[in-house]
Swiss-Prot record:
Biological processes annotated in GO: anatomical structure morphogenesis; anterior/posterior axis specification; cell migration; cell population proliferation; chondrocyte differentiation; condensed mesenchymal cell proliferation; embryonic cranial skeleton morphogenesis; embryonic digestive tract morphogenesis
DNA-binding in keyword set: yes
Organism in which the protein naturally occurs: Homo sapiens (Human)
DNA-binding region, residue range(s): 124-183
Similarity-based family: Belongs to the SIX/Sine oculis homeobox family.
Gene3D superfamilies: Homeodomain-like (1.10.10.60)
Name used for this protein in its record: Homeobox protein SIX2
UniProt subunit comment: Interacts with TCF7L2; in a canonical Wnt signaling independent manner; prevents transcription of differentiation genes in cap mesenchyme. Interacts with OSR1; form a strong repressor complex with TCF7L2, TLE2 and TLE3 to prevent the activation of Wnt/beta-catenin target genes in the cap mesenchyme. Interacts with HOXA11, EYA1 and EYA3.
Compositionally biased tracts (Pro residues): 249-259
Listed Basic and acidic residues bias regions: 179-190
Keyword annotations from UniProtKB, A to Z: Developmental protein, DNA-binding, Homeobox, Nucleus
SUPFAM superfamilies xref list: Homeodomain-like (SSF46689)
Function: Transcription factor that plays an important role in the development of several organs, including kidney, skull and stomach. During kidney development, maintains cap mesenchyme multipotent nephron progenitor cells in an undifferentiated state by opposing the inductive signals emanating from the ureteric bud and cooperates with WNT9B to promote renewing progenitor cells proliferation. Acts through its interaction with TCF7L2 and OSR1 in a canonical Wnt signaling independent manner preventing transcription of differentiation genes in cap mesenchyme such as WNT4.
Length: 291
């Protein structure tokens, strides 16, 4: 444990100071401490010093320097979670500045796809929203046992998975919400299925309580829709008048109105004459048919 030249601290002491200042959130003081370090290559390659430099670069918005540090050095797995957060948050901030608005879940997913984690801070294991599958497996197993872990259990789970206590709490909260939504959807589907099975419809699709078209038609009303078009359009037998001539009696518009002083025809005489012209030929023809 030799002292660094012209500095007065050992390498282990420098690493300890960096860790203490990071955990205390004294980023400005940490930056000044790093600036005061002597130009010793062995010291500047220390992992605690490199991590401290990455934290200072992030808080100062010097993302290019941050990316360079994270990509150029191989970090230990116990530092991966912290450095991965710096990598992703820096890219999120840059994307938000370009777009001029905060990123949603889809926007953050696209950023992660565009800027994947470098292997220097990632062991290559498949991740889902920055959760390793191994960590998710531990959380799922605990959830099956107890969906409501206590604060102490959340801290233990955080240590076992490498996540923060907040991440563990959010995972359980989101999982409970998804399960409640799935249960509500299943209940709704079951209720719809039961209501369909009790629907008062017979096999032909008609309501048992309803009535057919024949029942709706009054008995004294002729069913014009059932008449054959061919029958209506076929010419009448010789000697019989056309069906059109046997239609409804002429309306008021067909009866001539006498003009005062004009000597017009009597409407009553016209009506009797029209009736005779229709009925007399029919009587003669019916007599001929009967003979």
């Amino acid at each position: 444990m030799s002292m660094l030249p012209t500095f007065g601290f050992t390498q282990e002491q420098v690493a300890c100071v960096c860790e203490v200042l990071q955990q205390g959130g004294n980023i400005e003081r940490l930056g000044r401490f790093l600036w005061s370090l002597p130009a010793c290559e062995h010291l500047h390659k220390n992992e605690s010093v490199l991590k401290a430099k990455a934290v200072v670069a992030f808080h100062r918005g010097n993302f290019r320097e941050l990316y360079k540090i994270l990509e150029s050095h191989q970090f230990s797995p116990h530092n991966h979670a912290k450095l991965q957060q710096l990598w992703l948050k820096a890219h999120y901030i840059e994307a938000e500045k370009l777009r001029g608005r905060p990123l949603g879940a889809v926007g953050k997913y696209r950023v992660r796809r565009k800027f994947p984690l470098p292997r220097s801070i990632w062991d290559g294991e498949e991740t889902s929203y920055c959760f390793k599958e191994k960590s998710r497996s531990v959380l799922r197993e605990w959830y099956a046992h107890n969906p409501y872990p206590s604060p102490r259990e959340k801290r233990e789970l955080a240590e076992a998975t490498g996540l923060t206590t907040t991440q563990v709490s959010n995972w359980f909260k989101n999982r409970r919400q998804r399960d409640r939504a799935a249960e509500a959807k299943e209940r709704e589907n079951n209720e719809n299925s039961n209501s369909n099975s009790h629907n008062p419809l017979n096999g032909s699709g008609k309501s048992v309580l309803g009535s057919s078209e024949d029942e709706k038609t009054p008995s004294g009303t002729p069913d014009h829709s059932s008449s054959s078009p061919a029958l209506l359009l076929s010419p009448p037998p010789p000697g019989l008048p056309s069906l059109h001539s046997l239609g409804h009696p002429p309306g008021p518009s067909a009866v001539p109105v006498p003009v005062p002083g004009g000597g017009g025809a009597d409407p009553l005489q016209h009506h009797h004459g029209l009736q005779d012209s229709i009925l007399n030929p029919m009587s003669a023809n019916l007599v001929d048919l009967g003979s």
